[in-house]
Amino acid sequence: MATSEAPLLKRTAATLSDDMAVNYKLLHSPKFRALVVENVLSVTAFAFMARQTESLAGPEMETLNNCGVNGCGFTSFYQFKGVVGVYAAFWVYTVLLIGLYLFSRGPPPGTEFVVHALFTLCMIAFVSLSVISCTSTVIESDYSVCKNAAYAKASLVFAALVVVLNCATCAFVFKQWRSLQFVGMPENFRPFGRHRHKHGHHAGDADDAIPTHP
């Protein structure tokens, strides 16, 4: 009984070991390295903005007075709070994604592209609004909201770098998804999907069948 169980235990342990093995080859992938850089830049972006608890001028003179002599913090501006929220959420996402990739459990290209694209759109929106707010002048023509807010200005620089890297990552993931014939996307939404259907494409054709899962 014991002798028959020993090989089974060894096979089970070997299977678990293979499943939990770290994919070290992935460390040399440009896509993985870009993801790590995005992770570092995103945590830097929201950390700097979150540290801006004073020195911001209000969009109106009354706001400046209400914040006192030390000025406003980032919480007085929904744009800056949006930067903190979006980039903090993206940092958590990149941490999870890095962990999945290390153990060869990455999401399908379609899922990764959609999530990255949505994050990028939110980033572009809040960064653009923050830059507009940051450069707005109050009281005097040469006194901007972020004139004395070094952390906020640094945060927006790092945030913009993340947007650039995200756009490059989206392009790379989209190419991967396209090479898999947009697997997971409904037929009617695929490029040329309706055209192929009109010309006699059948789901039962083995040569033309598109898998629904990677």
UniProtKB/Swiss-Prot annotation:
Cellular component, GO, one term: plasma membrane
Residue ranges annotated as Extracellular topological domain: 104-112, 175-214
UniProt region (Disordered), positions on chain: 194-214
Spans traversing the lipid bilayer: 83-103, 113-133, 154-174
Keywords: Cell membrane, Membrane, Transmembrane, Transmembrane helix
UniProt signal peptide: none
Membrane topology according to the record: Multi-pass membrane protein
Origin species: Ostreococcus tauri
Subunit structure: Homodimer and heterodimers.
Compartments where found: Cell membrane
Source taxon at top rank: Eukaryota
The protein's name in its UniProt record: CASP-like protein 0U1
Disulphide bridges: none
Cytoplasmic side: 1-82, 134-153
Family affiliation: Belongs to the Casparian strip membrane proteins (CASP) family.
